């Protein structure tokens, strides 16, 4: 009789554990599918906001939400918000396609000096990736969000295709005039935040950038070799890397300073 009871209890326990496992499995995949659907539905709008010509901001407690490209004087706008907000700004939640280099460097310096963290909500490309992202105390990369590099003022002359304000140019005389000072400023900034100035260049030097945008990114290990640390991923690095593969964003590798 005792043996029969033990067998019954064992069977019930196995069935219970099996039911819990099946429920957990379906719940996980349901949540993941729901998240993926919501991501796809919101993706177009979020990207559009990140590429807006004019930057927009709003505050929620200690988080400053920033959307749109970086233009001249945006550093002054952000500085005023940060300095005058009663609650100290702890995090900047960014969604930006990049923009004006000098302004981005100034914003990066503000982030570094204030010890502000950054959350990449969807896009942090070009000058946003070059200067805002590495300057932050902590870096949080959301699901499917891109930290994309495609060069800097210190790119090889043959690959230097954008001016300080983001306007494309191929005139060597113009490039030399515009970039002579900004190249120095670029290196001084990286020296200040203890990050290698080669970070934006390695993917470009490997010629592995996305065919349409020239963008590439790095995994956590390569970021750390440049000096970019304290990175976390909302869904883990492996899930994030898979999302980059799906979107066709290649991973560059660490390279040493010239």
How does the language model describe each region?
Residues 8-23:
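Hydrophobic membrane-insertion alpha-helices, especially the h-region
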Residues 35-77:
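STAS-typified acidic loop motif
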Residues 66, 92, 133, 223:
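Terminal peptide-recognition signature
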Residues 75-79, 104-108, 112, 130, ...:
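Extracytoplasmic/secreted envelope proteins and their assembly/folding machinery
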Residues 87-103, 117-123:
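Short, glycine-/small-residue-enriched flexible loop/hinge segments at domain edges that mediate gating
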Residues 157-254:
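Charged, glycine-interspersed solvent-exposed loop segments at helix/strand-loop junctions
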């Amino acid at each position: 009789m005792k043996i029969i009871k033990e067998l019954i209890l064992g069977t019930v326990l196995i069935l219970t554990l099996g039911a819990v496992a099946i429920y957990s499995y379906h719940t996980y995949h349901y949540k993941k599918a729901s998240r993926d659907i919501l991501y796809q539905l919101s993706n177009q709008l979020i990207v559009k906001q990140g590429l807006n010509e004019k930057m927009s901001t709003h505050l929620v407690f200690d988080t400053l939400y920033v959307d749109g490209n970086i233009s001249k004087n945006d550093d002054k706008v952000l500085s005023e918000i940060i300095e005058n907000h009663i609650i100290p700004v702890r995090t900047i939640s960014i969604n930006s396609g990049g923009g004006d280099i000098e302004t981005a460097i100034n914003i990066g310096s503000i982030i570094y000096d204030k010890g502000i963290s950054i959350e990449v909500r969807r896009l942090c490309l070009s000058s946003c990736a070059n200067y805002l992202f590495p300057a932050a105390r902590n870096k949080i990369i959301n699901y499917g969000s891109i930290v994309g590099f495609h060069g800097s003022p210190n790119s090889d002359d043959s690959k230097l295709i954008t001016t300080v304000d983001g306007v494309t140019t191929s005139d060597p005389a113009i490039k030399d005039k515009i970039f002579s000072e900004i190249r120095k400023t670029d290196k001084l900034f990286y020296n200040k935040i203890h990050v290698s100035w080669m970070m934006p260049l390695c993917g470009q030097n490997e010629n592995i950038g996305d065919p349409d945008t020239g963008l590439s990114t790095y995994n956590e290990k390569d970021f750390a070799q440049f000096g970019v640390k304290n990175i976390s991923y909302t869904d883990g690095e492996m899930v994030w890397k898979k999302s980059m593969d799906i979107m066709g964003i290649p991973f560059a590798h660490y390279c040493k300073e010239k």
